[in-house]
Amino acid sequence: MFSRAQVRRALQRVPGKQRFGIYRFLPFFFVLGGAMEWIMIKVRVGQETFYDVYRRKASERQYQRRLEDTSETNLHKLIK
């Protein structure tokens, strides 16, 4: 692994310390976030992407909520 001194030395080599301070690392994280988003959209694992799974799960949750709401409504009608 890396020692603390090696990490510190690598971080000191990033330009813009006086002008931007700690914010000089933002472009790296911006690019990293964009790459991660691209992977989640484009890369398929099996037949699905991350967003396919997300949409399916959201749809399933919405369906379950509707079932619960209708069963509660029917229960209230039976009680009255």
Curated annotation (Swiss-Prot):
GO cellular component labels = mitochondrial inner membrane; mitochondrion
Going by the UniProt record, its keywords in alphabetical order are: Membrane, Mitochondrion, Mitochondrion inner membrane, Transmembrane, Transmembrane helix
Record topological domains on the Mitochondrial intermembrane side: 42-80
- Give each disulfide bond as a residue pair: none
Q: Which Pfam families match?
A: UPF0640
**GO biological process annotations for this chain's record?**
mitochondrial cytochrome c oxidase assembly; mitochondrial respiratory chain complex III assembly
The record places the following residue ranges in the Mitochondrial matrix compartment, namely 1-19
Keyword Transmembrane helix attributed:
yes
Question: Which membrane topology describes this protein?
Answer: Single-pass membrane protein
Q: Tell me where it resides.
A: Mitochondrion inner membrane
Tell me, what does this protein do in biology? Required for the assembly and stability of the mitochondrial ubiquinol-cytochrome c reductase complex (complex III (CIII) or cytochrome b-c1 complex), a multisubunit transmembrane complex that is part of the mitochondrial electron transport chain (ETC) which drives oxidative phosphorylation. Mediates early complex III biogenesis. Participates in regulating the levels of electron transport chain proteins, and therefore energy supply, in response to changes in energy demand. Also required for cytochrome c oxidase complex (complex IV) assembly.
Q: Please give the subunit comment from the record.
A: Associates with the mitochondrial ribosome. Interacts with UQCC6. Interacts with MT-CYB; interacts with newly synthesizes MT-CYB. Forms a complex, named COMB/coordinator of mitochondrial CYTB biogenesis, composed of UQCC1, UQCC2, UQCC4, UQCC5 and UQCC6; stabilizes nascent cytochrome b/MT-CYB and promotes its membrane insertion.
Q: Which family does it belong to?
A: Belongs to the UQCC5 family.
Entry protein name: Ubiquinol-cytochrome c reductase complex assembly factor 5
